[in-house]
Every structure is written in C-alpha cells, then in structure tokens.
A protein has these predicted regions:
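Solvent-exposed, non-transmembrane regions of membrane-associated and secreted proteins
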Residues: 1-84, 90-100, 105-156
C-alpha cells in the first residue's frame, strides 16, 4: 500500500499534538484515491485522518497521515521516526475531550511490502497509526521507498 502525494481540500477536524517531536496540527479528512491508496494532505504542514476507519478515540485502528517533507522543507511528520515507546500523542475530540495515546512501536516498511492488514486491520481497543514516508528518497519516482508507521494505544 502506498500513500498518494496529494489529498483533497477537506474540512478540519480536531487538533492533534505530539509534544516530544514538536507537532501541533489540525487534522483534515482523508479518503482514498481512485487507485485505492490513502490520500495525504495537499499541505505538508497538516496531518489528516482516514475517514474510512474509526475516529481517533473509537475502538479500532485510527489512521493519521502526514508528510515528512517537500522541496520547501520539513513536513508535519518530519520527526515522526524519532518517537519511542512511552511517548504521548494527544487528540482533541468532538465535545472537547482530550484523548491521550501512548506509543508502543515504530516501524519502517518498504512501500512494496506495506502490512496493510496490520496497519488498517481491527484492534480491540482505541489505537492510532501515524504514517509518513521514510527511508531513501528516489528522485526517479519522486518518492521515498518506505513508510514509517508509529503505533499507539489510548490510555485516557
């Protein structure tokens, strides 16, 4: 599974923050491209939530994607690969409730071996999957060869 480079101009949802890596972003809504891959935000400065899955804080694997960088510089998830088990992710939900997630794993996968079921599949409790590009940048295809995925479970 690959993420596409550009996503739609979409309405905002609620803000997210990852203080340990300096992320504070609004979340836009993301769907799928015509090819069936996850859209990503058109802007490198915001992250997006995949509306085909649960909302952050609902039971299951909520997927949030953002860019690592662009020709303009670092993107919202530039430092995502630096997250370690125990780090916290905060999502402000509808009604103002703050959901807190604890990172439990970080992996880098080749895009041609992306574990779609592990990332998008069911989870018994509310979890997050934070996704960005990583690995080596291939200028011939204009894309990174890997995806970095951070796994986090809701603790509050």
């Amino acid at each position: 599974m690959n993420v596409s480079w550009f996503g739609p101009a979409a309405t905002s949802t609620h803000p997210a923050s990852i203080p340990v890596i300096g992320v504070r972003t609004r979340l836009i809504k993301l769907g799928l491209t015509a090819q069936g891959t996850l859209q990503v935000p058109a802007s490198t400065s915001v992250a997006g939530w995949y509306t085909g899955g649960p909302r952050p804080g609902q039971v299951g694997s909520a997927v949030i994607a953002g860019h690592i960088d662009s020709y303009l510089g670092p993107g919202v998830f530039f430092r995502l690969r630096l997250l370690r088990p125990g780090d916290r992710v905060y999502i402000r939900q509808a009604g103002g409730k703050l959901a807190v997630f604890r990172v439990y794993a970080e992996h880098s996968y080749r895009k041609d071996h992306f574990p779609t079921q592990r990332v998008y599949g069911p989870a018994p409790d509310p979890e997050l999957r934070l996704i960005t590009c990583g690995g080596t940048f291939d200028p011939a295809i204009g894309s990174y060869l890997n995806n970095v995925v951070v796994y986090a479970a809701q603790i509050r």
